[in-house]
């Protein structure tokens, strides 16, 4: 049951900007979030492209810190991401990659920094969060999820897969 009255349709808060005008894309404060990816995570392919496209409207760059993953220019273009604003740092060692992500987030030169990093300690996560807040940037920690899903499978599934391995 609703106890408070509905606001009238002319409420200036609701209609403060035209519907076609996008919301501001500069976060008031930065943050770091973990995103799981893998064959069993199709939702990521629906969420990530619009986010990258919207962040591409900013004057800032997008940085991908990757171990082996290379963003496809064709895929980025098809998603509407401005490829001329995407930079990639490849083959950084784990410690260097964490440090690079921290410095990139803190600089404020990047709207988003995507990092394919090993699992982080609580102290490393805290450092990245503080850096993101200082630079008003978004940090996305990309984590593979296939192993976690297999571990969550019922015991019968593990027994059926005993003795076989799948390599990518």
UniProtKB/Swiss-Prot annotation:
Induction note: By DNA damage, as part of the SOS response.
Function: Component of the SOS system and an inhibitor of cell division. Accumulation of SulA causes rapid cessation of cell division and the appearance of long, non-septate filaments. In the presence of GTP, binds a polymerization-competent form of FtsZ in a 1:1 ratio, thus inhibiting FtsZ polymerization and therefore preventing it from participating in the assembly of the Z ring. This mechanism prevents the premature segregation of damaged DNA to daughter cells during cell division.
NCBIfam families: PRK10595.1, SOS_SulA_coli
Annotated organism of origin: Edwardsiella piscicida
Annotated site location: Essential for degradation by Lon protease: 168
Annotated signal sequence range: none
Protein name: Cell division inhibitor SulA
InterPro entries the UniProt entry points to: Cell_div_suppressor_SulA (IPR004596), P-loop_NTPase (IPR027417), SulA_CellDiv_inhibitor (IPR050356), SulA_enterobact (IPR047696)
Assembly description: Interacts with FtsZ.
């Amino acid at each position: 049951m609703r106890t408070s009255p509905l606001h009238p349709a002319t409420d200036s808060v609701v209609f403060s900007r035209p519907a076609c005008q996008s919301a501001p894309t500069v976060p008031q404060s930065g943050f770091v979030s973990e995103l799981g990816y893998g064959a069993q995570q199709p939702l990521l392919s629906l969420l990530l492209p619009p986010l990258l496209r919207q962040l591409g409207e900013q004057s800032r760059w997008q940085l991908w810190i990757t171990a082996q993953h290379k963003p496809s220019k064709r895929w980025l273009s098809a998603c509407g991401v401005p490829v001329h604003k995407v930079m990639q740092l490849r083959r950084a060692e784990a410690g260097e990659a964490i440090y690079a992500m921290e410095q990139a987030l803190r600089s404020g030169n990047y709207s988003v920094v995507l990092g394919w990093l090993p699992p982080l300690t609580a102290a490393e996560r805290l450092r990245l969060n503080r850096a993101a807040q200082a630079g008003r940037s978004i940090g996305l920690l990309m984590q593979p999820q296939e192993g976690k899903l297999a571990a969550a499978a019922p015991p019968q599934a593990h027994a059926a897969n005993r003795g076989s391995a799948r390599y990518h």
